[in-house]
Amino acid sequence: MFSFFKQIFKSLKKFFFLLFGIIFVLFSIIFLETSIVQLSNNLVSTYTTLVSKTNSSDIVAPAILKEANPVYIASLTNDSGYFSKIKIDDKKINYLFPYQENDFGSDSGQSNGSGDNQNKTIPRKGDVNEKDKLFLARKRGILKAYGEANIAEKRIYKGLAVSFNNTDSFNGSDISDSITNRHIISDPQNLIYDASGNLLGYFADGLIKETISLRAGIARFPGDKGKSTGTQVKITQKQQTNNDPQKDSTVNSLYKTNNKDKVWFKSDETKADNTDISANYLFTGGNEAANWFPNLYANIPIDLEIDPGSQFWKDVNPFKEIVEEFQTQKESKDNQSFTLTFNLDISKLNKLDNEQLKWLETNAKTIANNSSFGDWDLENKLKQLKKFELKINKDWLKKKVESEKDTILNSLPGFSDSDKDTIFKTQNGMMVRNNNLSFQPSSNNLQLVQNQNSQASNGIADPNFSNVQTAYNKIHQSNNTPEKTLDAVYAAVLDQWRSIFQEDLVKKTVDLLEKYRDHFLKATAFNNIDYSKQNIAIANNVSSAESASFLVSNKDEQRYNDLSLIDGVDLKSWLFKPEQNESNPLDTIYGGQDANNGFLQKIDYEFKPSTSSGGMTASLKNTQALSPKSTKFPIYPKLANIIAQAQLPEATNIPTTALDALKQWTNLDANGFNNLKEEDKRKAANNYLALLSYFTPAFQDPNELIETNRQMLEIPITVKNGVNPLILPTDQQNLVVQTPEAHGAVVSQQWLFRHNKEILPQEGEYAWKTALQTPNNFPNWLNDLPDRYKFSINGLTFAILGIGESVETGYPVLSLQSPLPNTQDEALIFVNDQAYRSILFAVPAANQENYYAFKSTDLKQHTDQDPVQFIANRLEGYLDVPRSDLAFNVKDISKFNYLTTARNYFPDLVQSYLAIVSTVIAIFLIILALYLIILLIKSFIKKNQTEFSIIRAGGFSTTKFIVGMSVFAGIVAIVSSFLGVLFAFLLEGQVKGIINRYWFIALPENSFNWLSFFGSFFITFFVFEFISWIAFKQLFSKPVNVLIDQGNETKFSVLLHLLKHKSHTMSPLTKFRVSLIVSRFSRLFTYVGLSSVALLLIGIAGTIPQKFSAAQTSTSLNRNFNYKLNLQTPTEQSGWYAIQPYSHFGVTDNNNGIKTLYNESVQANSQNEHPYKPSNLKLKNRQDQPIKAADGTELELGNLLLPSYGGAQQLNTDENFFRHASLSKWIIDFPIRVGGSNINPWEIVEKSIPKQITQLLSASSDQFLISVLTDDFFNNLNANGFLIRNPRTNQIQLDASRVLTTIDVFNPGGVKFNDSFLSFMLKVYGDFELAKQDSKLNFGIVPVDPAIEETYTYVEGPFGFQEDNLDENSPYTLTGINPESSFVNLIDGSGNSLRNLISSDQEMNVIVNAGFQYANNINIGDYVYIKPKNTATRYSEKFLKAPLNNSTVAFKVVGVSTDAFGQELYINQHIANNLLKLSGNQGRGIIRDVIKKTNGQSQSSDEYEIDYVKPNGYVPFNGVFSKELKPSLLNKALVLNSIIGVWGNFTDFGNNFQNLVRNKLDKVITSILPTDPEIINKLAQEKQIINTTSMNYESLRKELVNKYKTEWNSVNLLSQNASSIFGNNIIAPVLNIDAAGTSAQIIRNNAEVLFNTVNQVDAFLLGTIIPFIFITCVVLGISMLEEMKRIFISLKAIGYRDVQNLISLLTFFIPAFVLALLISIGVLAGVLIGIQAVVFNVAQVFLTNVFEFLPYMVGIVLFGVTIFVIGSYFWIKLRSAELKEGF
């Protein structure tokens, strides 16, 4: 046996190459299979493990609930009812004084300085130092609540004056609207009561409001100390002179108050220790003091709650006396009301609403007792929503018609202005007005001060109920035409009110249902079922280069929190809430179960009847049920303590815990409110203030604070009814609680590594626990944190707590434009709820997805039903989705309801795909391996056949032969297995990288796969041994002597046959060579297969990148831009877009239509215009020199909105306020303190701007200011402290005290920037490079800098290739370019320019790109057809009854550009403008203004005209090419456009619009009517204007304007008709923020991601598989030579030269390689066609039709090297061989 092993080892040398070949092939098999199987297993096992360890859900139900749509049925009856007895006649100046003036005492020792004896006639009850009752605690408490922190003993205190809110007057003074002469104010007579006399609310034109609008303030008491009643204020009759009122000269002095008493308030930072209220949170304050004048401008708007609900609420209400007056001063009248009864139609409710309403009724008491929603009276509210009776005073009805008889008919259906003479019989009346105002208090402490009016009858009769009811019932009958009677008018008004109130009822019902939706579902459909509500948002980041977009996952409040933390701080531990613990995630804010620590710890009290005194008393609520007369209310002791500490610095007994505060409250309430008086009057007032703080916080539901839109809690320190007990510095009007958790995030592993970020360390100054332990230092900690530990999203900063992953975000689709996510550049982050909401607020156009998630294993515990069907059945009738989509498994690839879950099936798909690929490769390589093993064993046996036969004859068994062969088997198995697994381990990262780039799940780290090693070893070993057994079994099936004889024979049969055979056509050697190929056909097949695969892979790896590169090169030659931005086509009404370089935004450019916002002449102390002069707004350079334009004019910053009181006024009065205005957030976003009230101009503007716009501005504004302050020049200029960092928001803002002029309450026009700051600001914007970094909101001006931008005009509409077959939803647009464009080159395949083909303005030619030609198989000479729809007249055409016949336009294809990205069609821009009707002489241009006609005279007429500007060289456009990688139009300039040409503070035709255009109908109609001559002519014909053919354009349009003035003669008619034409989205962004997805840059980015991936695959192929194949070819060739060595040596022996033998060898290899080359080229051609189709469909990239032979040259060279190696080996062996070796 030993000898046998020795013989085998000797033979190894002879079979080395064949043995090496086997080892290499097996190595390849093991390497590839191990890699692929390991990757597949990693993917699937990782996914499975993740599902298991994260408690992940696998069933999804869309959170798309059916919308509530309740229906109410209304009926009209006549009924008795209660009505207010309080009457106000004049409705101009109406004061209510709850107290007598002498209630607050008089300073007997102080003289008024006049010596008038009338001073002594003031009624008073004694000196303030003697009579305690003059300082009743309640009244002093009210004063203190209004800011009188230090009440001087010797001081006259004026009472709290309350006036009804006059929206057309200014602060109660005698100033009315000079244009309308209308006084719309609150009237107590409009209070409305229910059938039992309970006060319901205030009736206002169809609505019942729960509040009445008042104004209040101690500074507004008319009169002054020492004045007698005879010298009280007299307000003169207003005289109109230039619309300005004239007052008595004494008014100003009489209205001024004594401001000598100042209060200085000092705020100390609250320490963060264990017992303090600020545990774990920061309360910002600082040692700043605020100078506050308590009597200055104290005019506070009040929305007074009419019915507080209980005596307790009255007692803590500063307007208790007024409320009581409203409640008690009522009377019952018979037949005085029209009663509208509203019944909810239960039969019309959907299943969700019906069942939820029943659930609410059943659980109303439970909800009222335990809810934090504030619905303490839910049961009664539900009853009212099901049936409500609205009692309308018939006097209101008459007064409505009477006061608006001149305009009301135009607002009523079926009536018009022409019916006035028929319906109303007018009598001339006389008005008598008494202007003497009396302020003497009445006996019941209520005085009504009013102008007395008397008015004669004007012919308006009282409504007759029977007649009105008859007319009312006819209104909704079909084909009803109302009679022209007064009763029909009354009925129409009632129906209007019915409609308004019905809508209000519907809204209230919908709001209530939606408020409890989740609670209802949890209690019903999801009862006893565990579920989570997933919240995921795709957010774009505009303020940081760290990442283009983030996938943000809210991991708060989830039952199935599928966050798996790989490393870092355990975010999940403090987010996940077990089922048994439903506390808020921010428990330390609310207190959790520890009442001593919760900042917003709520304690429930109830106010109930006292058994002893018969009054009402407050106590802790200790019963579940409330008595019928008791009221539950919450108190927030710690919040009250903070207020008390801030308000009462002299107080010494401030509790520090909730329990102490509870005791204090108990003491305060011990004797009831009626016994609050104490000897210490100051303490009594303080107690009253404390009560206000406890019981009237500004919020009812503390949970609202969690839904903050910033990474902190901001709590307004105000209480109800206008009382503001906390006097803080200007920038600290809110209590700010910094919540560190909202600044923490877990990120994806791939993104962390890509951006060189790190997780926070566990210890040290940068550890997370350090931040939590010192919350008062958190902002500084965050600022000091190195960049590697944090990242930002649009100004929000997050510390990196760890890296993690989750199932539901494992492989998401982040964009429809780019289906493959890019985990290297796109970040996946996990945050808590507060951070999630903050991101949604700071991110523009965030795409949010919400759905319910369930776990099938949990559901199976509740039912035997299929879990998906179980959930579907539970939700049937609740969700607004098809029955089949109510629920589905996340791996169901047919349900692409959510982008983020659309790829959850990916692991299974990858596994299947890799299994198929690995199987195919494995089969091929296994066949090859088996072939080589068989060849090795066969060759080895044949080589030693004689020796084996002799050994066999000596008694050697077959088993021993097999054991001997184990040497071969062992060497092959161990070497191939070890190397295969080792290389798989070493290269696993590369294999994973191809997939891992597009998956947010982190794959496990590489590890040596011992299982694969041992498995492959044993499989290889036993396969080798099995084949050996078969071979020996077959060998020894013959007798031994036969075997010995066969082994000694010389096999010359083939050679001898060829040598003896005579042939006339082929020499013997040639025949031998042919026979050599044919006799080894199996090897030929193997070589051809291997070579074909190698060449194919080389061709793919080399050709496709070349095609990608060619596509990029050809596209770059055609496109000299990065972005193509389609804008909203300007309308006729809006006019052409003005253009300016972005760095010049805000600069006046009159020649280009940008008119200044400011006037050079500013009226002194004006309150109605901007206080800025253009001459004072000239831009300066750093040397303080004016900056000039090219024509030498000095540039003025006259179009940047600057803060001013006049600007705030114009915002609500100027319908052209925003025309060509620029707005920068930092300039106006700071609090301005005006007489005790805070004004933030940005907040005013923000209300009129779409949310996504304001979010983007908010996100990027701070970045600009950082750039300003990091510039040394401007940082030095900021030494005055213009710019400061707000410590509580951590953002830079202006300091009002340093940038504004001194503010005088009587000169609000003083709200303006001072000269020092103006100089600073003008230098900032004079630095154009710096100015480009600012984000500006702009109206009507598009940023176009000729150096980096160029305009174009695109045409869209129905498109097709046949004139009669157009696709209405075609995605194609025609891009009209300047034929001399420097941004679009249009190069054909030969490198020639095609632009001259579209240079003509007359020829309708189009050039298409290669992508369009490929997608549509179109050729030069073909035609395309389009019907333009984005015309400038698209809205003007809607004025016509019969639309214009817009014809289809044909374009001839005259060229194909090599542009390969996307599908493009290019035409001449002038032709495009003509198609869109942007060109033309009349009604076209940049609209500078709408002005009154002058008619050639100095004075203007009453007619208006549009002032157009047509700059030289200007070409209309609706699109912009940009070379910038981050175009200002996309990242900085947010441009809004008004499609109606009116530029006011509105976005629709609602209240803002109506208020602005009231009495400006002529001007507005002039603006919004069509200007196109063709439409004007057709519209004139429809309006039956005669002699249209003889009129010129101006005359014809004038006639139309006059016609529409008649038809649209009211604001309501204008709004209704205009909204039907223009829709409601009338001021909108010119560029949709989402539209960037269609830009060239995005397509290019997607393509580059795809290219990079292909290159990675190519590198893998070239680096691993291809070398395997070539080495295998070399090994096979050498092994074949070993077999044929004897033949060639024999040929050499008989005289054939070595060269001839070498040629004989090449005749085998060369045909094999040529055949392989031909096969690979054919297969590659088919593969390229398929790849081209796939790439174009996925990435819209046309791979150019190029075939690269260079890769094949590389392949041929490699094969040449292979043949050379084989030939060299053959040559060496042949040269050194002796003849005996051949035998």
UniProtKB/Swiss-Prot annotation:
Phosphoprotein as UniProt keyword: no
Segments crossing the lipid bilayer: 16-36, 917-937, 967-987, 1010-1030, 1084-1104, 1660-1680, 1709-1729, 1730-1750, 1752-1772
GO CC terms, sorted: plasma membrane
Low complexity biased stretches: 105-119
Membrane-topology annotation of the record: Multi-pass membrane protein
Metal-binding listed as a keyword: no
Keyword entries, A-Z: Cell membrane, Membrane, Transmembrane, Transmembrane helix, Transport
Region (Disordered): 105-125
Protein localization: Cell membrane
Family: Belongs to the ABC-4 integral membrane protein family.
Record protein name field: Uncharacterized ABC transporter permease MG468
Organism: Mycoplasma genitalium (strain ATCC 33530 / DSM 19775 / NCTC 10195 / G37) (Mycoplasmoides genitalium)
